[in-house]
A protein has these predicted regions:
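Membrane-helix and juxtamembrane interface regions of eukaryotic multi-pass membrane proteins
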Residues: 1-154
Length: 154
């Protein structure tokens, strides 16, 4: 749980914030299992129309749909129904938003998974793409462990 500090905003234990509640490991496991099941299934179902690389990219995109849809749902829910919870400028800067935290945890898991999955295919293993995934995951990690501007994150 977040600990109150003497400052305006909450500080959190990094390990607990990212891994402690099981959200990130669950997303990582779900995406991995989904990909491992879909990839051979797609190759088997469409042997003539989808070659090995086509099956990889299709399985990759199908798996990526779920965390991206979840982030869109959480963001839309927060935007339309929860922004009134932040009434002061201090709250808009320093308060923790459960919806932003959900988006950040899901996106951290997705970017981490995407980094390793991208290394398995030459089209997605370009250095700039891998750097993008690492930097996006790092930004999510920082936003989870040092809550700042969650109001603007959704």
């Amino acid at each position: 749980m977040p600990k109150k500090s003497s400052s305006v905003y909450e500080t959190v234990d990094a390990w607990e914030a990212v891994w402690g509640d099981g959200v990130v490991p669950t997303w990582l496991a779900g995406m991995t299992v989904g990909f491992v099941l879909l990839f051979p299934l797609l190759k088997m179902m469409f042997p003539k129309t989808i070659k090995k690389h086509g099956a990889f990219l299709l399985a990759f995109e199908i798996v990526a749909f779920f965390p991206l849809f979840y982030c869109a749902y959480e963001g839309a829910t927060a935007w339309w129904f929860k922004l009134d919870d932040f009434t002061t400028k201090e709250q808009r800067l320093y308060a923790t938003s459960p919806h932003a935290r959900n988006v950040l945890q899901c996106n951290f898991a997705f970017q981490t998974w995407d980094f390793f999955a991208s290394m398995l295919h030459k089209e997605t293993a370009a250095p700039e793409m891998l750097a993008h995934h690492l930097l996006a995951a790092l930004l999510c990690y920082w936003a989870i462990t040092m809550p700042y501007m969650h109001y603007y994150g959704v």
